[in-house]
């Protein structure tokens, strides 16, 4: 009897975890629409048509836009 109870609890825990994970049991995301991945957001940049004065272009964004990253400090001219 104790073996059956532990087996049942294991099955219940696995089913709860499968339901709560975003990818499901095998990693498929069929119920949710997957958004396109933008590399610019990984570096906390913004996609713009032109970068501002204190930003640098690092990568390209979709639709031929520029990925603008802010400098860590304000750069002053000498």
Swiss-Prot record:
Pfam family, one: Defensin_beta_2
Compartment(s): Secreted
Tissue specificity remark: Highly expressed in the cauda epididymis.
Keywords: Antibiotic, Antimicrobial, Defensin, Disulfide bond, Secreted, Signal
GO CC annotation: extracellular region
Keyword Isomerase attached: no
Cysteine disulfide partners in this protein: 40-67, 47-61, 51-68
Top-level taxonomic group: Eukaryota
Signal peptide feature range: 1-23
Keyword Secreted appears in the UniProt entry: yes
GO biological process, one term: defense response to bacterium
Family the UniProt entry places it in: Belongs to the beta-defensin family.
Function statement: Has antibacterial activity.
Name used for this protein in its record: Beta-defensin 29
Organism: Mus musculus (Mouse)
Gene responsible for this protein: Defb29
């Amino acid at each position: 009897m104790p073996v059956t109870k532990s087996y049942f609890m294991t099955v219940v825990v696995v089913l709860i975890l499968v339901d709560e994970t975003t990818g499901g049991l095998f990693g498929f995301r069929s119920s949710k629409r997957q958004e396109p991945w933008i590399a610019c957001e990984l570096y906390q940049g913004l996609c713009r048509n032109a970068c501002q004065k204190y930003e640098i272009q690092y990568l390209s964004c979709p639709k031929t836009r520029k990925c603008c990253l802010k400098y860590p400090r304000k750069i002053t001219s000498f």
